[in-house]
Amino acid sequence: MTRLRRLIATALVDSFGLSLGWTVFSLQITRSHGLAGLGLCNAAMLVGVALSAPVAARLSARLDGRALLRVTCVTEAALRIGTFALLLAGAPLAVVVVAVAASNVVAWTGYAGMRAEVAAADPRGSAMTWYMVAVAAIEAAGTATAAMLPTGPGGLVSGGLLVAVVAGYGACLLPTWLVAGGALVARAAPLPRAGGLRAVLRGGRLLPNGPPNGLLAFGGMVMLLGSGPTLLAVGLAAELHGTRWVAGSALAFAAGSLLAPLVVARLERRTLPPAVAWPALGIGMAGGWAFAAWSPVALLGAQLLSGMCMSALEGDMDARVATKAASPRGVTAGLATAAALRAFGSAAAVAFAPRVVAEAGVGWLGGALATSLAALAVLRLAGRWSRSAAGRGVGVATARDL
């Protein structure tokens, strides 16, 4: 078996166990603390994703690929099991939320290390694409499997089966420890201190020749307005149509994700500016949820649209960052910061969405978010047109002066 195939096989085992365990965890949270509790845990997860960018940069400058993967996989396994144990022991929700955030900082640091190993094993873009598609597909399978597990009187996985799920949640990282023995990635050179997310927040430049920082922030805003219902899909599907439809919801999202490359290719052919393309994708993410409560079929349609549009938005945004980078090091820093900004937007989305759903319903939320994204596109285009008109006016005046 080649190195790339071993890495993909490792990712399949880990991602299946992760998605199965996280889905069971999410259903437990929803039953114990409601959709608001699930929203807080998802927000903590996304904050962990965002914080993993600087952690990964620092660790990769101190550890080679083998050490980084082994340190993160052992730490993550302990945090996965510990977080589940805290929930089942009745720990305060705030403690569980902190544990979820910490677990995801470590998880996404390790995930960055795995992607670096994939690139080292096969630098072709198609290799990374296959890796990402394999992860997305197996995560959908894990979510669907969790939704179909036998449940106890409370409608939740319990007893010995629950113990097995929790144990597997941590043990599925064992292949990562083993594959780390053949790591190819050396310790990285330290990144310049001026780059990254901190530079964006201070108003500095993310990349020397990169896209405008406002463009990256705009992508985060689209995620804020468009991603909330999708990221709460496990809880929403269970509340709207029953636990069994969680499986179909996950599979519909995965099917939509497979269509995303076609959407991005069409956007590239039409050369649509982000001011139009990104809010349109956000409308696709949120708009279908306006009808998701009508029937299970409407739920599946909403998730199909969400998977297609969310994956396309992330792919298009990352492609714009990567093509503007002056060096591979710039690509890494740029992509990490773009992911962090998206994660912060999504964290805010899943924090406020449960309250709106509780008061007005998911249909109202989906419609309101889609309308807000349409208004955002109009405002963005109006700003572009006014700046363009001002530029033409200056050009005419200069010609006359000459």
Which ranges hold each PLM region?
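Intracellular juxtamembrane helix-capping segments at the cytosolic ends
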Residues: 25, 108-122, 233, 312-326
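C-terminal ends and interior cores of transmembrane alpha-helices
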Residues: 74-91, 281-294
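C-terminal transmembrane helical hairpin of 12-TM major facilitator-type secondary transporters
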Residues: 273-314
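A late C-terminal transmembrane helix in Major Facilitator Superfamily
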Residues: 328-360
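Cytoplasmic helix-loop-helix junction between adjacent transmembrane helices
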Residues: 99-137
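Helix-loop boundary and gating motifs at the non-cytosolic
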Residues: 1-50, 202-253
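Helix-to-loop junctions at the C-terminal end of transmembrane segments
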Residues: 51-67, 150, 258-273, 357-358
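Hydrophobic core of transmembrane alpha-helices in multi-pass small-molecule transporters
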Residues: 12, 92-110, 220, 298-312
